[in-house]
């Protein structure tokens, strides 16, 4: 099967070829969407991920039929997107978003057993940096029940599109005297909520306190 084109056809001036820019996006958000065809039908699912060097790593239950299909060589498309702002133009037609959006095409492969624990630690630290040092190690049973997959981030199997400009209103709208601009967006974290079975005298771990400052 031939690989889909990675050339941006709609607004091609927004395509970015910088690998560093791709890595910055992948490292900034923990959620990806994975699409594949299984039993003749398209399926898609969200999943946490981490970039480990030049590979994109996901994990899940060994009982997942979709993950098993990926581990057996099903072609996949992975989408990662973050919203950075709302572009408020002088009309609904011209209003849009600031965003960074990447799509990767390829085939996942199983991470060998001797590298599985390290990849899972990378995934955990992606979500809460520093927490791996505060947690117990995964048990053999947990590792055996977990499927860890990786996809190579090559030189030609990804596409990155970035929109970061100002409203592009026609002159007659600019002259109408209506406000236009950008509302920046960012992710923030609230105060930690203690689990009902967690005694009050157990301190909040450093990794959680840093995340929520």
Please annotate each region the language model reported.
Residues 1-5, 115-213:
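C-terminal edge-of-domain segments
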Residues 2-57, 68:
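An N-terminal domain-cap segment
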Residues 30, 45, 52-54, 72-76, ...:
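A generic structural signal for short beta-strands and their flanking turns/coil linkers
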Residues 48-50, 71, 142, 152:
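Well-ordered beta-strand positions
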Residues 55-57, 77, 159:
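General beta-strand recognition
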Residues 56-60, 149:
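A generic structural motif
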Residues 63-122:
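Short, structured beta-strand-loop surface elements
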């Amino acid at each position: 099967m031939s690989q889909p084109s990675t050339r941006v056809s709609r607004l091609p001036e927004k395509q970015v070829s910088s690998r560093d820019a791709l890595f910055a996006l992948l490292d900034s958000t923990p959620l990806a969407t994975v699409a594949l065809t299984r039993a003749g039908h398209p399926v898609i699912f969200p999943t946490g991920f981490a970039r480990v060097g030049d590979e994109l790593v996901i994990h899940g239950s060994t009982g997942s039929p979709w993950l098993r299909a990926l581990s057996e060589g099903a072609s996949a498309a992975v989408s990662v997107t973050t919203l950075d702002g709302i572009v408020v133009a002088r009309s609904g037609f011209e209003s849009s978003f600031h965003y960074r959006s990447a799509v990767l095409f390829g085939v996942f492969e199983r991470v060998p057993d001797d590298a599985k624990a390290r990849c899972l630690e990378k995934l955990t630290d992606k979500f809460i940096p520093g927490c791996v040092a505060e947690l117990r190690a995964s048990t053999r049973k947990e590792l055996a029940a977990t499927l860890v997959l990786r996809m190579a981030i090559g030189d030609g199997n990804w596409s990155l599109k970035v929109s970061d400009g100002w409203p592009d209103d026609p002159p007659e709208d600019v002259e109408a005297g209506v406000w236009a601009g950008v509302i920046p967006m960012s992710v923030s974290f609230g105060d930690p909520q203690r689990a009902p079975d967690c005694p009050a005298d157990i301190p909040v771990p450093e990794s959680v306190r840093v995340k929520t400052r």
